[in-house]
Amino acid sequence: MPEIRRRPHGPILEKPALKNPTATLRRLLGYLRPHTFTLIMVFVFVTVSSILGVLSPYLIGKTIDVVFVPRRFDLLPRYMLILGTIYALTSLLFWLQGKIMLTLSQDVVFRLRKELFEKLQRVPVGFFDRTPHGDIISRVINDVDNINNVLGNSIIQFFSGIVTLAGAVIMMFRVNVILSLVTLSIVPLTVLITQIVSSQTRKYFYENQRVLGQLNGIIEEDISGLTVIKLFTREEKEMEKFDRVNESLRKVGTKAQIFSGVLPPLMNMVNNLGFALISGFGGWLALKDIITVGTIATFIGYSRQFTRPLNELSNQFNMIQMALASAERIFEILDLEEEKDDPDAVELREVRGEIEFKNVWFSYDKKKPVLKDITFHIKPGQKVALVGPTGSGKTTIVNLLMRFYDVDRGQILVDGIDIRKIKRSSLRSSIGIVLQDTILFSTTVKENLKYGNPGATDEEIKEAAKLTHSDHFIKHLPEGYETVLTDNGEDLSQGQRQLLAITRAFLANPKILILDEATSNVDTKTEKSIQAAMWKLMEGKTSIIIAHRLNTIKNADLIIVLRDGEIVEMGKHDELIQKRGFYYELFTSQYGLVVEKE
């Protein structure tokens, strides 16, 4: 069911920084559980390749001591063959594990996007009122992509790093304890530097993703409203607004990159310090004939292996931080409270269309009431018009009837049942609606018309189109009913889009019909034809009509007049005119008529 127009109330889901990266990481890794066997296979490949990698420095040291120092070059081919085989196997295993992890990460991304999209179908409408649409799109697309970029590489590097570190430490202590302790002396400094830098960069990467969502929101809004922007020559103002947010993104992005960019050179400095210590102590031990030159070469190799995982982590650091920030933003949506039916909610069966509002109060922000003590009763089959100036509460009444929002106080009943005791899907499927702002989808004309009644036949579709006088222009489209519409039917005129929306409501054939400014975008001739067909359509249906042009609702069974969220008058057209009240003022202000009391 399409949504009635709503009022935005500013963004939600804004937090100053990433709260708990450990919990976020743990939850993100939970998406890998279905792939446990695949991960075990990858970890076996990683373990074997890491062990082979750990052996290479030892073999290089042995080659120096066995081949080059005693000048036994006849043994060189044997050692070269062994080293070459190790390097070849290591490369093959790295390729295999990378290929598997990239496939696995794509599956995780698929599941995340699927869960996000399904969640967005179940959250209350108020969430979309308060959250910029571009920010939501950014979470579904950009934030999930950030996670994909990290999962494909970082998990392998993390596990490979652990195995390599463990293997390197074991081999170093087997070769020489003193040089092993010298190599490990740089670890506390490495951990300290990483902790200091990470605590600063985490908040900037979260802020970077939040501002990126704002920028996406501006782009999405400007593209959809480009005609209005050009009409009012607001291009410069829109560019200024874009520049402000873009500048904020530049600043926060620069800070994030600067802070994260500090880590690699600092780690490089620590690594060089480790090499210097090994070379210095190793040279001193070699002069005393405690170790050989090959042992020094072995330790330099192990030192590189020991620091390589730390270096890789620092190089991936900004991606990891961004992925954690993105995961936090994704989980914020996944943790939103969903629209839930009452445990005892019932299905509407054999809908009669009786509607009753009892002392209904409502406010969007829980502060200023939009509706105040609204009470009225609509009998089955009645045609009721809601009339009032902009902001009087007409659309809000429809929002509440559709249960896009729940009342603060009072009751709304359909067929004598409180709508909070009716399943939302059952309630909404009983109501057909024509929006003021027509919503069409990027599919064929026929599929758009069938949206409220997927089982409609081609004959039923054409009959409904003839009733609404839309058949004549549909037949002249390039592919007729099979013509694929562009974004929201922008290749059609506003009147044509309105006619398609009316036809869609015809096909749905609900017991309750809501017409929100149904003919406000149609020319006078077409409007008269539609009005005749529409009154015929409304026979036997409970119909609620919202219209500012009061001449379209003269024949309504009941007119409810609203002002500032309150009902000020109710009655038929002639009765209200004779009262010379607020409705009389509205009517005469539109048509310049002075109607004498009889």
Swiss-Prot record:
Pfam families: ABC_membrane, ABC_tran. Belongs to the ABC transporter superfamily. GO terms for biological process: transmembrane transport. The lineage of its organism: Bacteria, Thermotogati, Thermotogota, Thermotogae, Thermotogales. SUPFAM superfamilies: ABC transporter transmembrane region (SSF90123), P-loop containing nucleoside triphosphate hydrolases (SSF52540). Residues 39-322 form the ABC transmembrane type-1 domain. The keyword NAD does not apply. CDD domains: ABC_6TM_Tm288_like (cd18547), ABCC_Glucan_exporter_like (cd03254). It is found in: Cell membrane. Residues 355-589 form the ABC transporter domain. ATP binds at G388, P389, T390, G391, S392, G393, K394, T395. This is Uncharacterized ABC transporter ATP-binding protein TM_0288. The keyword Transmembrane applies. InterPro entries: AAA+_ATPase, ABC1_TM_dom, ABC1_TM_sf, ABC_transporter-like_ATP-bd, P-loop_NTPase, Type_1_exporter. GO terms for molecular function: ABC-type transporter activity; ATP binding; ATP hydrolysis activity; ATPase-coupled transmembrane transporter activity.
